[in-house]
């Protein structure tokens, strides 16, 4: 059976197996026989034909719902070369999770996603993006607002004017942009829109300067903070598809008693006029470039071979029966395109040898040549 016929059947058979394990043997039909279901298949570009030709043909023959979208990406490289398990040129997820926050990797991979062209993973870029974009832009804004609010208004905050009109308009535009990008599986574009909105929030916060307002007009400062807390709420919802754990953590700090994953997507546009915050902690910890490069950079290449067997002695070498022969005849192998049949004279009976040199040497190149045989 052709491997790509059997492989894609795993989508279907796994769902049946899952349904049986749930004690609901017909539950799989909700996806495969439901006209309202939408199938998405995420992969690299080399697997496109199997999911756009072979798999749809199989589904059509069975009368099942066809794929809705096949959002294939270009390649993700590691230090400008392809990942390879055999060469140990890879990032091993268990090792990564032992050392780092998984949400950092989610953010980084989404930010460099190879949607239009190959992308390159480097540890230097990983640290730089996490520190400057995720922490310096997004994480810093949320922590600045929440920590300042809890420090200066520990009893809670209330305002009859909870919406900053300029920020609210930018949030609506970003919400539309993020929504369209996610629906089109353009995750990098969606994340970029969120980060642009966060940067706009940082600029607006610096302009509002609540640290100055609190000294001159506490009521105005309270209104400013309520507006920015609502803005942080919107950011948390928008970021939740990318960073579910830290988004929920921020949601909890904002005094919410719900789960973001249970909310509707439109809750990103909701506002409230009062907050009772919990004492926040920074959502992320800044990375140390030197420490990470020391841990993650591959060791310098060496010419030493691992597990080399000891050399044989000359006495052992003399025991080998090595004979020199002359190629007298070359024929094509009747059943293989890459093999030659060689008749070789070693000074006695002519030996027939099969060799994989066809395609490398022509017939005339081999005739009369000498070779050694053990």
Regions found by a protein language model. Name each.
Residues 1-151, 192-194:
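Structured secondary-structure scaffolds
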Residues 25, 52, 90-93, 102, ...:
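Alpha-helix initiation and N-capping motif
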Residues 44-47, 85, 96-97, 126-137, ...:
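Secondary-structure capping and boundary motifs in well-ordered enzyme cores
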Residues 74-76, 125-126, 160-165, 196, ...:
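A glycine-rich phosphate-binding loop feature that marks nucleotide/adenosyl-phosphate handling sites
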Residues 195, 199-374:
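Basic, alpha-helical terminal appendages of large translation-related enzymes
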């Amino acid at each position: 059976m052709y491997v790509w016929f059997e492989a894609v059947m795993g989508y279907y058979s796994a769902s049946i197996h899952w349904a049986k394990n749930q004690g609901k043997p017909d539950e799989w039909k909700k996806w495969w026989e439901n006209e309202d279901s939408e199938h998405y298949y995420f992969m690299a570009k080399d697997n496109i034909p199997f999911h756009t030709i072979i798999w749809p043909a199989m589904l059509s023959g069975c009368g099942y719902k066809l794929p809705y979208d096949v959002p294939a990406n270009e390649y993700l490289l590691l230090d400008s070369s392809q990942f390879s398990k055999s060469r140990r040129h890879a990032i091993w997820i268990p090792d990564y999770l032992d050392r780092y926050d998984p949400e950092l990797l989610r953010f980084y991979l989404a930010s460099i996603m190879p949607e239009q062209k190959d992308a390159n993973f480097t540890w230097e870029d990983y640290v730089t993006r996490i520190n400057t974009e995720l922490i310096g832009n997004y994480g810093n804004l949320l922590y600045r607002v929440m920590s300042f609010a809890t420090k200066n208004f520990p009893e809670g905050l209330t305002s009859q004017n909870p919406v900053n009109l300029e920020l609210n308009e930018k949030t609506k535009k970003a919400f539309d942009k993020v929504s369209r990008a996610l629906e089109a599986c353009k995750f990098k574009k969606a994340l970029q829109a969120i980060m642009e909105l966060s940067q706009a929030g940082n600029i607006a916060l610096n302009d509002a300067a609540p640290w100055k307002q609190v000294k001159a007009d506490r009521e105005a400062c309270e209104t400013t903070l309520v507006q920015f807390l609502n803005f942080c709420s919107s950011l948390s919802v928008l970021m939740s598809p990318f960073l579910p754990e830290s988004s929920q953590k921020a949601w909890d700090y904002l005094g919410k008693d719900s789960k973001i994953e249970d909310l509707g997507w439109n809750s990103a546009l909701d506002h409230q006029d009062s907050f009772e915050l919990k004492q926040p902690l920074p959502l992320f910890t800044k990375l140390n470039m030197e420490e990470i490069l020391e841990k993650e950079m591959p060791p310098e290449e060496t010419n030493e071979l691992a597990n080399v067997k000891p050399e044989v002695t000359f006495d052992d070498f003399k025991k080998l029966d090595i004979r020199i022969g002359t190629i007298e005849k070359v024929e094509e192998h009747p059943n293989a395109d890459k093999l030659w049949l060689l008749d070789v004279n070693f000074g006695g009976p002519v030996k027939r040898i099969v060799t994989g040199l066809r395609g490398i040497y022509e017939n005339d190149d081999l005739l009369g040549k000498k070779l050694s045989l053990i």
